[in-house]
């Protein structure tokens, strides 16, 4: 069975300007939205940096494994930014809110693949206590 890593090997050489985003790209963007880019990606939509640059800053963090859902997310980030397709995707408009006293969690990030579109992804329920409570309160 093929996975996102196989897809990156197969189509990683095709920039988004050549072939626009497809469902597998959206899955990759959604998965990457679970990475905690606090202090790396700006909340300001006008301060766009390449995903490669965000990854470089993230990957040197000593506690990076605590800032992801699963370790495979780190591997996916590394694999993605080592492709022509994802390396220069812009990222900004990042927001991560974790407010236990309000039982609130929210996270979103915007990707700019370079084909004239903006892709906004929202992080779903995570494995924090707030996420667990949020899931059970539905």
What positions do the PLM features span?
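N-terminal low-complexity, Ser/Thr- and acidic-residue-enriched intrinsically disordered segments
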Residues: 1-72
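A conserved cap/lid and substrate-binding interface adjacent to the catalytic center
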Residues: 53-138
């Amino acid at each position: 069975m093929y996975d996102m890593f196989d897809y990156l090997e197969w189509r990683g050489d095709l920039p988004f300007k050549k072939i626009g985003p497809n469902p597998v790209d959206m899955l990759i963007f959604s998965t990457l939205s679970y990475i905690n880019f606090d202090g790396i990606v700006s909340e300001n939509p006008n301060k766009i940096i390449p995903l490669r640059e965000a990854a470089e800053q993230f990957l040197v963090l000593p506690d990076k494994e605590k800032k992801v859902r699963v370790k495979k997310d780190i591997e996916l980030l590394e694999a993605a930014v080592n492709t022509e397709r994802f390396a220069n995707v812009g990222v900004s408009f990042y927001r991560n809110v974790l407010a236990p006293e309000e039982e609130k969690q929210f996270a979103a990030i915007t990707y700019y693949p370079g084909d004239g579109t903006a892709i906004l992804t929202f992080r779903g329920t995570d494995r924090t206590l707030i996420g667990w409570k949020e899931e059970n309160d539905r």
